[in-house]
Amino acid sequence: MTEMRLTPLEIRGIAEAFVAARRGARPLAAFPVRLPNALDDSVAVQEEALRLTGERVAGWKVAMVPPPLRVPLAAERLAGPVDAATLIRCDADAIVEVAVYEGGFAAVEAEFVVVLGDEPRPRAEGFTAESIRDAVAWIHAGVEVASSPL
């Protein structure tokens, strides 16, 4: 089976639809254009949305790909940008209010937030657990309130 990759026009159309929905704080009735079936296309949509908004990336969220999607996407993990404007730093006893999309999707996830002090240095064999561990300055508990217009 040949996978149908998204065209540049489709990538832009998906990104524009999500950016407009987020800016208008309104849900989407369905996925715009068509659902990407390749991880590279999903990343391209994400990059186009960042370009359209001009948002600054504060960091990256690393997540596991659900087991049924690992073979089709040829990936076990993926990384997505954390928008600096949505990052809230607070004391442990603080009460924080965040908006979610009415009619969209929302979830709360516990996270480990890793702050790197130095850039990890790859070794001849690539990055190792030791080279990454040596670069870690802090590990914090975090909460992600994930919300999407879809």
Where are these regions (language model features)?
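Catalytic-core "active-site belt" of small-molecule-metabolizing enzymes
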Residues: 2-150
